[in-house]
A protein has these predicted regions:
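Short hydrophobic/aromatic-rich beta-strand segments that constitute the beta-sheet cores
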Residues: 39, 61-65, 80-83, 129, ...
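Sec-dependent N-terminal signal peptides
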Residues: 4-13
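Gly/Pro-enriched, hydrophobic low-complexity segments
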Residues: 113-114, 118, 122-195
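An acidic-aromatic
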Residues: 48, 52-103, 166
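Boundary at the C-terminal end of the N-terminal hydrophobic targeting segment
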Residues: 15-19
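Short, solvent-exposed helix-to-loop capping segments enriched in aromatics
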Residues: 29, 99-111
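A short, Trp-centered hydrophobic/proline-enriched beta-strand micro-motif
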Residues: 27-46
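Envelope-exposed proteins and targeting segments
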Residues: 33-35, 49, 57-59, 69, ...
Length: 195
């Protein structure tokens, strides 16, 4: 009787979703031209911030934070710029290649070909892929969390390899909207803030 119950239980329990293939995830990024989403950023210290994220592939992303934060993070021209409205100084700038985010902002993403996938698992309806640039392991890794049906990036976690983790949860996606390039122009933003 116990075996029959177990068999019936297995028959009515839905099978776990299969993980998305690396080729499917690569195609997801490669076919994305522009995207916009709401985000919630969670930091190691327990603090949270919200805002809007804008992506224009390849190589550009913008995070506009909601009040009271009002920070702005821009990626364009191979650079990352962090604008802090509390400081009347130039933005903090560093090369995009020094962040794991560069792996998904490349012109052509090919996860199956490059030796950057550290882990590729699924957790029910979610596929989790952990990426690290093998040539720049000192800059940490990024963990991407996707749902399928429809396939969508829902979250990422960046570990900077010095013990700091930042989690970004995404919702309210829109894709392939017109987006002016000025949104990602760091020099133009600096000039605007100087006036």
């Amino acid at each position: 009787m116990k075996k029959i119950f177990t068999l019936l239980f297995l028959m009515v329990t839905p099978a776990s979703a299969e993980k998305l293939s690396l080729d499917a995830v690569s195609s997801y990024f490669n076919t994305m031209t522009t995207a916009e989403a709401a985000f919630i950023q969670s930091n190691d210290d327990g603090s949270q911030s919200t805002g809007r994220m804008y992506i224009k592939r390849p190589g550009r992303i913008r995070f506009e934070y909601d009040p009271p934060n009002l920070a702005l993070v821009m990626v364009g021209g191979g650079q990352v710029a962090v604008f802090d409205p509390k400081a009347n100084a130039e933005p903090i700038r560093f090369p995009l290649r020094q962040t794991p985010l560069s792996l998904v902002l490349e012109r052509t993403v090919d996860l199956a070909r490059r030796d950057m996938v550290m882990a590729h698992t699924n957790d029910g309806p979610r596929t989790i892929i952990t990426l690290q640039d093998p040539d720049r392991a000192e800059y940490g890794y990024i963990q991407l969390v996707f749902t399928d049906d429809p396939m969508q990036l829902r979250q990422w976690i960046v570990d900077d390899n010095s013990g700091n983790k930042t989690q970004i949860a995404l919702s309210d996606w829109t894709q392939d909207q017109k987006m002016p390039s000025i949104l990602f122009n760091i020099q133009a933003e600096m000039q605007k803030r100087a006036n």
